[in-house]
Swiss-Prot record:
Entry GO MF terms: ATP binding; GTP binding
InterPro entries xrefs: P-loop_NTPase, RapZ-like, RapZ-like_N, RapZ_C
Source organism per UniProt: Endomicrobium trichonymphae
Record family assignment: Belongs to the RapZ-like family.
Binding site for GTP: 60-63
HAMAP family: RapZ_like
SUPFAM superfamilies documented for this protein: P-loop containing nucleoside triphosphate hydrolases (SSF52540)
Residues annotated to bind ATP: 9-16
Protein name stated in the entry: Nucleotide-binding protein TGRD_433
Pfam families: PapZ_C, RapZ-like_N
Protein's UniProt keywords contain Chloroplast: no
Keywords: ATP-binding, GTP-binding, Nucleotide-binding
């Protein structure tokens, strides 16, 4: 069986942000899906319940007159024994007006913002009255909203598993990585490139690993470096960051940065973090 969440509510109350949060939690998400095709879409999901195990769809006032058939859709779900939960996102009129003013966006119903809000409340009442959960986002931060959704959706994902940590080794001679959140330079380590027999090896090779680990400054550095990263990651999780890229660079991106990245990845995995490792320049061999 699939886990289905129907996201609805007032425009400007956080539906789009909520759908992004569901997506970060691994849900298959569809925004503003027409009511007429929801049943067919769910049938597709049921045929591949492994791939579509967790599904979140957004239905709102943009559906127009088709919203009149929303309750009929719920009857279809019940007949097919499809479990679902409707989450309605709401906010006070004053907060909605302020958010529209800040973003300078038009109301989707094409009226003035105040008129649009008033009309939308009438239209969305048919969903509001059948909602399983109503979330007032007037005073919620993004982090708080994420916690509320994780509880409502019964997502037992630890913060460590929520944060996707990418560790990237690179060579400065080929340029800085564009997507790095943190960049650390390990060119202070004696370069194995100039040691006989190590030039065409990489930081993955045992001989290179032993050469670097014998350097006292590396041991001191890595103890401090790993503790620094371990100390800061919970803060990123607290601030609701779902992706973090740590880039480690040396001259050519083959020896020192590769070994350090490998060692950091192993350290974080031992601490139960979800880690992806990539060596950008490991295959480049300039003479």
């Amino acid at each position: 069986m699939i886990k289905l969440y129907i996201i609805s509510g007032m425009s400007g109350a956080g539906k789009s942000q909520a759908l992004k949060i569901f997506e970060d939690f691994g849900f298959v998400c569809v925004d503003n899906i027409p009511i007429q095709i929801v049943a067919d879409f769910i049938d597709i999901c049921l045929k591949d319940s492994i791939r579509y195990k967790n599904v979140a769809i957004s239905v709102d006032s943009r559906a127009g007159k088709s919203l009149t058939s929303f309750k009929d859709l719920l009857i279809v779900f019940k007949k097919k024994n499809i479990g679902y939960k409707i989450i309605f996102f709401n906010a006070t009129d004053s907060v909605l007006l302020r958010r529209y003013s800040e973003t300078r966006r038009r109301h989707p119903l094409g009226k003035s913002v105040s008129e649009g809000i008033k009309l939308e409340r009438k239209i969305m009442d048919r969903i509001f009255t059948v909602a399983d959960e109503i979330i007032d986002t007037s005073d919620l931060t993004i982090g708080e909203l994420k916690k509320v959704i994780s509880m409502l959706a019964d997502i037992c994902q630890s913060g460590k598993q929520y944060l996707n940590t990418s560790i990237l080794s690179f060579g400065y001679k080929y340029g800085l990585p564009n997507d790095a959140d943190i960049v650390y330079d390990v060119r202070f380590i004696t370069n194995p490139n100039y040691v006989h027999g190590l030039k065409f090896k990489t930081g993955r090779d045992e001989a290179v690993r032993k050469y670097i680990e014998r350097q006292k400054e590396f041991s001191v550095f890595f103890n401090i470096f790993s503790k620094l990263i371990e100390t800061t990651l919970p803060g990123y999780i607290k601030e609701s960051k779902s992706h973090l890229t740590i880039a480690i660079g040396c001259t050519g991106g083959q020896h020192r940065s590769v070994f350090t990245a490998e060692k950091l990845a192993g350290f974080l995995k031992s601490k139960k973090y979800k880690v992806k490792l990539n060596h950008r320049d490991i295959l480049r061999h300039d003479n």
